């Protein structure tokens, strides 16, 4: 494969990881599990799930284990009409750095990697002059909630129970009880229902016991850290619904802080990048 110097220069800058789109160019960076594994990206129709195109990354595009590609957006639907998955060694791999996903199954349903097709966020959000409340710590009155649990019960009397929109509907209640700082338990995307690995029973023959799926209600595990949880969104656009919630809380003088769970394997530099993203893109007030 021949490559000109302009393309080569672009390939040498693998960050940020994931896929972004700007000025008719899709910028793709994928960190492979192994530098020797064949890998690439698969594009889908966002609505139907139909495969549009499968691409393979080339050795010349690799920096260490990271493959970098800039792709002119030609012979493809509009960016907002497509989704994608990476592939490696024949397996489909969700983008850990995705900023959004296609609509997801209801909370508590089993999901696999192929369900987590990522989407490109191309629409700008109008924050309408949003300003952080900046409540002095000595004056803060905190209130910690699980987004789903806070309004899911019928007694909450909201139109959109168990969602970010439901939290927005409860702002008058939060004001009434004097809350200045709302703390959210994990509200990023995570796989809440998993089937544990089969375990070998204590018998002479190698018989394996099929375990039932277990539910992680709280979300304290590694997740897709850049995306508000789809099951906590009434609409198909969890990013917009989350930002609407933050903006309305700020208008009412209430701060929003978030809890994250990071296993020890996540580098501190990546943690800083994630938190910075939520501050800049979602206007959250702290962690």
Model-flagged regions — what are they?
Residues 1-25, 50-54, 61-146, 151-159:
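The feature marks proteins involved in alpha-glucan
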Residues 26-33:
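Short edge beta-strand/loop segments characteristic of extracellular beta-sandwich folds
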Residues 30, 145, 174, 184, ...:
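Conserved, mostly hydrophobic/aromatic
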Residues 134-139, 175-176, 251, 280:
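Extracellular/periplasmic catalytic domains that process cell-envelope and extracellular macromolecules
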Residues 141-143, 182-184, 256-258, 287:
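Hydrophobic faces of well-ordered beta-strands that scaffold small-molecule active sites
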Residues 156-163, 195-251, 264-284:
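Aromatic- and acidic-residue-enriched carbohydrate-binding clefts of CAZyme catalytic domains
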Residues 169-188:
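Catalytic domains of carbohydrate-active enzymes, especially glycoside hydrolases
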């Amino acid at each position: 494969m021949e490559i000109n110097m302009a393309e080569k220069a672009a390939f040498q800058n693998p960050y940020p990881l994931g896929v972004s789109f700007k000025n008719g160019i899709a910028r793709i960076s994928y960190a492979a599990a192994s530098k020797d594994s064949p890998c690439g990206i698969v594009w889908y129709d966002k609505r139907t799930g139909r495969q549009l195109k499968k691409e393979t990354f080339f050795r010349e595009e690799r920096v260490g284990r990271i493959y970098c590609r800039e792709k002119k957006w030609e012979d493809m639907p509009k960016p907002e009409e497509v989704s994608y998955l990476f592939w490696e060694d024949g397996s489909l791999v969700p983008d850990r750095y995705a900023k959004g996903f296609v609509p997801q199954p209801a909370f508590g349903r089993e999901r696999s990697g192929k369900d987590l097709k990522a989407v490109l966020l191309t629409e700008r959000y109008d924050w309408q002059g949003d300003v952080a409340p900046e409540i002095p710590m000595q004056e803060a009155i905190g209130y910690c909630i699980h987004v789903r649990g806070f309004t899911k019960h019928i007694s909450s009397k909201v139109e959109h129970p168990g969602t970010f929109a439901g939290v927005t509907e409860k702002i008058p209640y939060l004001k009434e009880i004097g809350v200045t700082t709302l703390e959210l338990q994990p509200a990023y995307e995570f796989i809440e229902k998993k089937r544990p690995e089969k375990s070998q029973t204590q018998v002479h023959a190698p018989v394996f016991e099929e375990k039932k799926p277990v539910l992680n209600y709280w979300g304290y595990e590694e997740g897709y850290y850049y995306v508000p949880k789809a099951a906590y969104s009434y609409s198909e656009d969890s990013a917009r619904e989350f930002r609407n919630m933050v903006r309305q809380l700020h208008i009412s003088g209430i701060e929003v802080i978030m809890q994250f769970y990071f296993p020890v394997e996540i580098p501190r530099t990546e943690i800083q990048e994630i938190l910075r993203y939520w501050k800049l893109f979602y206007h959250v007030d702290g962690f």
